[in-house]
Amino acid sequence: MAGLNVSLSFFFATFALCEAARRASKALLPVGAYEVFAREAMRTLVELGPWAGDFGPDLLLTLLFLLFLAHGVTLDGASANPTVSLQEFLMAEQSLPGTLLKLAAQGLGMQAACTLMRLCWAWELSDLHLLQSLMAQSCSSALRTSVPHGALVEAACAFCFHLTLLHLRHSPPAYSGPAVALLVTVTAYTAGPFTSAFFNPALAASVTFACSGHTLLEYVQVYWLGPLTGMVLAVLLHQGRLPHLFQRNLFYGQKNKYRAPRGKPAPASGDTQTPAKGSSVREPGRSGVEGPHSS
Protein backbone atom coordinates (compact mmCIF):
# COMPACT_ATOMS: atom_id res chain seq x y z
CA MET A 1 0.00 0.00 0.00
CA ALA A 2 2.90 2.35 0.73
CA GLY A 3 4.28 1.79 -2.77
CA LEU A 4 0.89 2.60 -4.27
CA ASN A 5 0.67 5.84 -2.31
CA VAL A 6 4.16 6.84 -3.44
CA SER A 7 3.31 6.10 -7.08
CA LEU A 8 0.05 8.04 -6.97
CA SER A 9 1.72 10.97 -5.24
CA PHE A 10 4.43 11.04 -7.89
CA PHE A 11 1.81 10.86 -10.65
CA PHE A 12 -0.19 13.84 -9.43
CA ALA A 13 2.89 15.82 -8.39
CA THR A 14 4.34 15.53 -11.90
CA PHE A 15 1.07 16.65 -13.43
CA ALA A 16 0.78 19.62 -11.06
CA LEU A 17 4.37 20.76 -11.68
CA CYS A 18 3.93 20.56 -15.45
CA GLU A 19 0.68 22.51 -15.24
CA ALA A 20 2.42 25.22 -13.20
CA ALA A 21 5.27 25.35 -15.72
CA ARG A 22 2.78 25.60 -18.58
CA ARG A 23 0.96 28.52 -16.99
CA ALA A 24 4.26 30.30 -16.30
CA SER A 25 5.35 29.77 -19.91
CA LYS A 26 2.04 31.14 -21.16
CA ALA A 27 2.45 34.27 -19.04
CA LEU A 28 6.15 34.92 -19.75
CA LEU A 29 6.81 33.72 -23.30
CA PRO A 30 5.57 35.31 -26.55
CA VAL A 31 2.37 33.81 -27.90
CA GLY A 32 4.09 32.06 -30.82
CA ALA A 33 6.81 30.51 -28.66
CA TYR A 34 4.25 29.23 -26.17
CA GLU A 35 1.79 27.83 -28.71
CA VAL A 36 4.39 26.10 -30.86
CA PHE A 37 7.13 25.04 -28.45
CA ALA A 38 6.59 25.30 -24.69
CA ARG A 39 3.06 23.88 -24.70
CA GLU A 40 4.12 20.75 -26.58
CA ALA A 41 7.19 20.24 -24.38
CA MET A 42 5.10 20.45 -21.21
CA ARG A 43 2.46 18.05 -22.46
CA THR A 44 5.08 15.51 -23.55
CA LEU A 45 6.66 15.70 -20.11
CA VAL A 46 3.33 15.36 -18.34
CA GLU A 47 2.33 12.44 -20.58
CA LEU A 48 5.54 10.46 -20.16
CA GLY A 49 6.81 11.54 -16.76
CA PRO A 50 4.10 10.19 -14.43
CA TRP A 51 4.53 6.64 -15.70
CA ALA A 52 7.89 6.46 -13.90
CA GLY A 53 5.75 5.51 -10.92
CA ASP A 54 5.40 2.02 -12.44
CA PHE A 55 1.72 1.32 -11.81
CA GLY A 56 0.17 -2.10 -11.80
CA PRO A 57 -2.30 -3.16 -14.49
CA ASP A 58 -5.24 -2.66 -12.13
CA LEU A 59 -4.63 1.11 -12.00
CA LEU A 60 -3.07 1.72 -15.39
CA LEU A 61 -6.26 2.05 -17.45
CA THR A 62 -8.00 4.22 -14.85
CA LEU A 63 -5.06 6.60 -14.62
CA LEU A 64 -4.74 6.64 -18.40
CA PHE A 65 -8.35 7.77 -18.69
CA LEU A 66 -7.89 10.45 -16.02
CA LEU A 67 -4.65 11.66 -17.61
CA PHE A 68 -6.18 12.15 -21.06
CA LEU A 69 -9.26 13.70 -19.51
CA ALA A 70 -7.08 16.24 -17.69
CA HIS A 71 -5.08 16.85 -20.87
CA GLY A 72 -8.20 17.84 -22.75
CA VAL A 73 -9.15 20.37 -20.08
CA THR A 74 -5.84 21.97 -19.14
CA LEU A 75 -3.28 21.79 -21.92
CA ASP A 76 -4.69 24.20 -24.54
CA GLY A 77 -4.86 21.70 -27.39
CA ALA A 78 -1.27 20.43 -27.15
CA SER A 79 -0.92 16.87 -28.43
CA ALA A 80 2.53 15.53 -27.34
CA ASN A 81 2.14 13.23 -30.35
CA PRO A 82 4.20 13.68 -33.53
CA THR A 83 1.51 12.14 -35.73
CA VAL A 84 -1.03 14.72 -34.50
CA SER A 85 1.40 17.51 -35.39
CA LEU A 86 1.88 15.97 -38.85
CA GLN A 87 -1.90 15.68 -39.18
CA GLU A 88 -2.22 19.42 -38.55
CA PHE A 89 0.39 20.03 -41.25
CA LEU A 90 -1.42 17.81 -43.78
CA MET A 91 -4.70 19.55 -42.93
CA ALA A 92 -3.03 22.91 -43.76
CA GLU A 93 -3.64 24.05 -40.18
CA GLN A 94 0.06 24.48 -39.38
CA SER A 95 3.05 25.68 -41.38
CA LEU A 96 6.17 23.59 -41.94
CA PRO A 97 8.36 25.66 -39.55
CA GLY A 98 5.67 25.47 -36.87
CA THR A 99 5.39 21.70 -37.32
CA LEU A 100 9.16 21.25 -37.04
CA LEU A 101 9.21 23.32 -33.85
CA LYS A 102 6.44 21.18 -32.37
CA LEU A 103 8.35 18.01 -33.20
CA ALA A 104 11.48 19.46 -31.59
CA ALA A 105 9.49 20.40 -28.48
CA GLN A 106 8.07 16.88 -28.25
CA GLY A 107 11.58 15.44 -28.51
CA LEU A 108 12.78 17.78 -25.77
CA GLY A 109 9.85 16.83 -23.55
CA MET A 110 10.58 13.15 -24.15
CA GLN A 111 14.20 13.56 -23.06
CA ALA A 112 13.12 15.50 -19.97
CA ALA A 113 10.64 12.76 -19.10
CA CYS A 114 13.30 10.05 -19.45
CA THR A 115 15.63 12.02 -17.18
CA LEU A 116 12.84 12.44 -14.62
CA MET A 117 12.07 8.73 -14.85
CA ARG A 118 15.67 7.67 -14.15
CA LEU A 119 15.94 10.20 -11.32
CA CYS A 120 12.77 8.91 -9.70
CA TRP A 121 13.94 5.31 -9.91
CA ALA A 122 17.32 6.26 -8.42
CA TRP A 123 15.56 7.67 -5.35
CA GLU A 124 14.11 4.18 -4.70
CA LEU A 125 10.97 5.58 -3.12
CA SER A 126 9.33 2.16 -3.27
CA ASP A 127 10.18 -1.46 -4.00
CA LEU A 128 8.75 -1.07 -7.49
CA HIS A 129 11.14 1.80 -8.19
CA LEU A 130 14.08 -0.26 -6.95
CA LEU A 131 13.05 -3.10 -9.25
CA GLN A 132 12.70 -0.77 -12.21
CA SER A 133 16.11 0.75 -11.52
CA LEU A 134 17.70 -2.71 -11.55
CA MET A 135 15.86 -3.74 -14.74
CA ALA A 136 16.34 -0.47 -16.62
CA GLN A 137 19.25 -1.80 -18.67
CA SER A 138 17.53 -5.10 -19.52
CA CYS A 139 13.91 -4.16 -20.13
CA SER A 140 11.63 -6.39 -22.18
CA SER A 141 10.11 -5.26 -25.44
CA ALA A 142 6.55 -3.94 -25.57
CA LEU A 143 6.14 -5.63 -28.96
CA ARG A 144 4.72 -9.08 -28.20
CA THR A 145 3.68 -10.14 -31.68
CA SER A 146 5.16 -10.29 -35.17
CA VAL A 147 6.38 -7.10 -36.82
CA PRO A 148 3.72 -7.04 -39.61
CA HIS A 149 0.92 -7.74 -37.13
CA GLY A 150 2.27 -5.12 -34.74
CA ALA A 151 2.45 -2.51 -37.49
CA LEU A 152 -1.14 -3.32 -38.48
CA VAL A 153 -2.32 -3.02 -34.87
CA GLU A 154 -0.60 0.35 -34.38
CA ALA A 155 -1.96 1.60 -37.71
CA ALA A 156 -5.51 0.57 -36.76
CA CYS A 157 -5.22 2.26 -33.36
CA ALA A 158 -3.87 5.45 -34.92
CA PHE A 159 -6.58 5.38 -37.60
CA CYS A 160 -9.39 5.26 -35.02
CA PHE A 161 -7.69 7.87 -32.85
CA HIS A 162 -7.07 10.39 -35.63
CA LEU A 163 -10.47 9.89 -37.24
CA THR A 164 -12.05 10.67 -33.87
CA LEU A 165 -9.88 13.78 -33.50
CA LEU A 166 -10.93 14.98 -36.94
CA HIS A 167 -14.62 14.50 -36.20
CA LEU A 168 -14.36 16.25 -32.82
CA ARG A 169 -11.88 19.02 -33.65
CA HIS A 170 -14.59 21.71 -33.63
CA SER A 171 -16.44 20.29 -30.61
CA PRO A 172 -16.23 21.89 -27.15
CA PRO A 173 -13.62 20.34 -24.80
CA ALA A 174 -16.43 19.25 -22.50
CA TYR A 175 -17.49 16.74 -25.19
CA SER A 176 -14.25 15.98 -27.04
CA GLY A 177 -12.12 15.45 -23.90
CA PRO A 178 -14.11 12.55 -22.38
CA ALA A 179 -14.67 10.99 -25.82
CA VAL A 180 -10.95 10.94 -26.66
CA ALA A 181 -10.04 9.72 -23.16
CA LEU A 182 -12.54 6.87 -23.40
CA LEU A 183 -11.33 5.91 -26.88
CA VAL A 184 -7.68 5.83 -25.77
CA THR A 185 -8.57 3.71 -22.73
CA VAL A 186 -10.59 1.18 -24.75
CA THR A 187 -7.87 1.02 -27.41
CA ALA A 188 -5.18 0.44 -24.78
CA TYR A 189 -7.24 -2.35 -23.24
CA THR A 190 -7.89 -4.02 -26.62
CA ALA A 191 -4.51 -3.69 -28.33
CA GLY A 192 -2.31 -3.53 -25.24
CA PRO A 193 -1.46 -7.26 -25.17
CA PHE A 194 0.06 -7.01 -28.67
CA THR A 195 1.96 -3.70 -28.87
CA SER A 196 0.99 -1.82 -25.66
CA ALA A 197 -1.10 0.43 -27.97
CA PHE A 198 1.21 3.44 -27.99
CA PHE A 199 0.19 4.92 -31.41
CA ASN A 200 2.52 7.75 -30.37
CA PRO A 201 6.06 7.68 -31.84
CA ALA A 202 7.48 9.84 -29.02
CA LEU A 203 6.01 7.64 -26.29
CA ALA A 204 7.15 4.43 -27.98
CA ALA A 205 10.68 5.73 -28.54
CA SER A 206 10.93 6.68 -24.88
CA VAL A 207 9.55 3.46 -23.43
CA THR A 208 10.58 0.54 -25.63
CA PHE A 209 13.15 1.44 -28.31
CA ALA A 210 16.07 0.74 -25.96
CA CYS A 211 14.71 -2.65 -24.93
CA SER A 212 16.07 -5.91 -26.28
CA GLY A 213 14.09 -8.35 -28.40
CA HIS A 214 13.81 -6.43 -31.68
CA THR A 215 16.02 -4.28 -33.86
CA LEU A 216 15.67 -0.53 -34.20
CA LEU A 217 14.36 -0.95 -37.76
CA GLU A 218 11.60 -3.28 -36.54
CA TYR A 219 10.61 -0.81 -33.84
CA VAL A 220 10.50 1.99 -36.42
CA GLN A 221 8.27 -0.07 -38.72
CA VAL A 222 5.79 -0.82 -35.95
CA TYR A 223 5.76 2.31 -33.80
CA TRP A 224 6.56 5.04 -36.34
CA LEU A 225 5.44 3.88 -39.78
CA GLY A 226 2.33 2.14 -38.42
CA PRO A 227 0.83 5.22 -36.69
CA LEU A 228 1.90 7.47 -39.57
CA THR A 229 0.07 5.24 -42.06
CA GLY A 230 -3.05 5.15 -39.90
CA MET A 231 -3.03 8.94 -39.59
CA VAL A 232 -2.72 9.48 -43.37
CA LEU A 233 -5.57 7.04 -44.03
CA ALA A 234 -7.77 8.82 -41.47
CA VAL A 235 -7.18 12.20 -43.13
CA LEU A 236 -7.89 10.73 -46.57
CA LEU A 237 -11.13 9.12 -45.39
CA HIS A 238 -12.29 12.26 -43.59
CA GLN A 239 -11.30 14.84 -46.23
CA GLY A 240 -11.01 12.79 -49.40
CA ARG A 241 -7.58 14.38 -49.94
CA LEU A 242 -4.50 15.70 -48.16
CA PRO A 243 -5.32 19.43 -48.11
CA HIS A 244 -1.70 20.61 -47.82
CA LEU A 245 -0.63 18.50 -50.81
CA PHE A 246 -3.68 18.11 -53.08
CA GLN A 247 -6.47 20.52 -53.90
CA ARG A 248 -8.50 17.99 -55.83
CA ASN A 249 -10.73 15.65 -53.87
CA LEU A 250 -9.48 12.14 -54.58
CA PHE A 251 -12.39 10.15 -53.13
CA TYR A 252 -15.55 12.23 -52.97
CA GLY A 253 -17.21 14.14 -55.81
CA GLN A 254 -17.65 17.87 -55.45
CA LYS A 255 -21.29 18.99 -55.35
CA ASN A 256 -22.20 22.25 -57.02
CA LYS A 257 -23.58 24.58 -54.39
CA TYR A 258 -25.47 26.61 -57.02
CA ARG A 259 -28.56 24.81 -58.33
CA ALA A 260 -30.53 25.78 -61.39
CA PRO A 261 -34.11 26.80 -60.58
CA ARG A 262 -36.66 24.16 -61.30
CA GLY A 263 -39.73 25.04 -63.38
CA LYS A 264 -43.24 24.37 -62.15
CA PRO A 265 -44.33 20.97 -63.50
CA ALA A 266 -47.07 21.10 -66.17
CA PRO A 267 -50.40 19.47 -65.29
CA ALA A 268 -51.06 16.00 -66.63
CA SER A 269 -53.21 15.60 -69.76
CA GLY A 270 -55.97 13.89 -67.86
CA ASP A 271 -56.21 16.50 -65.14
CA THR A 272 -59.31 18.72 -65.07
CA GLN A 273 -59.44 22.12 -63.53
CA THR A 274 -62.53 23.63 -61.97
CA PRO A 275 -62.84 27.28 -62.98
CA ALA A 276 -63.05 29.83 -60.26
CA LYS A 277 -66.37 31.42 -59.49
CA GLY A 278 -67.25 34.21 -61.91
CA SER A 279 -64.65 33.25 -64.49
CA SER A 280 -65.36 32.00 -67.99
CA VAL A 281 -63.67 29.24 -69.90
CA ARG A 282 -62.40 30.17 -73.30
CA GLU A 283 -61.54 27.76 -76.01
CA PRO A 284 -58.30 28.33 -77.83
CA GLY A 285 -58.66 30.06 -81.17
CA ARG A 286 -61.96 31.78 -80.26
CA SER A 287 -62.47 35.26 -78.92
CA GLY A 288 -64.17 36.03 -75.71
CA VAL A 289 -67.09 37.81 -77.54
CA GLU A 290 -69.91 35.59 -78.78
CA GLY A 291 -71.05 36.02 -82.40
CA PRO A 292 -74.63 37.02 -83.31
CA HIS A 293 -75.49 33.54 -84.51
CA SER A 294 -74.27 31.76 -81.44
CA SER A 295 -76.88 29.76 -79.61
From Swiss-Prot:
Membrane topology recorded in Swiss-Prot or TrEMBL? Multi-pass membrane protein
Q: What is this protein called?
A: Putative aquaporin-12A
Location in the cell? Membrane
> Assembly state and interactors?
Homotetramer; each monomer provides an independent water pore.
- Give the family per the record: Belongs to the MIP/aquaporin (TC 1.A.8) family. AQP11/AQP12 subfamily.
The terms describing its cellular component in GO are: cytoplasm; membrane
**Function text:** Putative aquaporin. Could form homotetrameric transmembrane channels, with each monomer independently mediating water transport across the plasma membrane along its osmotic gradient.
Which organism does this record belong to?
A: Homo sapiens (Human)
Q: Which Pfam families does this UniProt record tie to the protein?
A: MIP (PF00230)
Q: Spell out the residue ranges making up region: Disordered.
A: 257-295
Domain of life assignment: Eukaryota
